[in-house]
Amino acid sequence: EMMSRVPMLSDQAAIWTDVKTAIKSRIFMMGSGADLIASINKITRLEADTQAFNSQQKAVYAQRNEHFKSIVPVFNSHKNIVCKEDECIRAETTIQNLSALKPSFREIGESGVDNLQLKYFSELSEIVHIHTAGNSPAMSDAASMTLLSSSSSSASSDYKSRGIIKEVSVVNADPMLVLSG
């Protein structure tokens, strides 16, 4: 993903920007699914904020103690920019400043998504909107690489194997829950 160059929703895809299309497809933004999951599991805003705070504190500790050794620096020769650490760790995060943030997905919920979710999850009387910019995943650029090889290829190289894939399976859940599998 390259969120700094292609911001979320900048492609104006109807599945994300047109509630009628999303409702017809039963595919929603992750935040709508997160609020639905919070509603089903009775997760409170304070619990979500506390989890976010604890996560940030663990990340700060790990970064300060150099536990992110697998991060490889990325150099941009045109702008002389070096990315060598996770830039989304927020050491200044507190429960107080998290609690002051407004829910990010209430508006899209009120535009029709909540009603559809309530139709399919009739045990719920409301969708709680607890997710904010502070307790949701950061919007960031990301890259990763996985090097896969055969056993014989690994044995003949200078790289030490870090794992073995023994089985693969595919699982899918209700698309309205988005984040559940």
Cite the ranges covered by each PLM segment.
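Catalytic-loop motifs flanking and including active-site residues across diverse enzymes
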Residues: 26-30, 138-144, 178
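N-terminal extracellular/periplasmic Venus flytrap/periplasmic-binding protein-like
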Residues: 47-152, 156
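Flexible glycine-/small-residue-enriched beta->alpha junction loops
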Residues: 1-37
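Glycine- and Gly-Pro-enriched alpha-helical subdomains that act as flexible
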Residues: 151-181
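Conserved thiamine diphosphate
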Residues: 27-53
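A short glycine-threonine-serine/GTX helix/turn-capping micro-motif
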Residues: 16-26, 130-137, 174-176
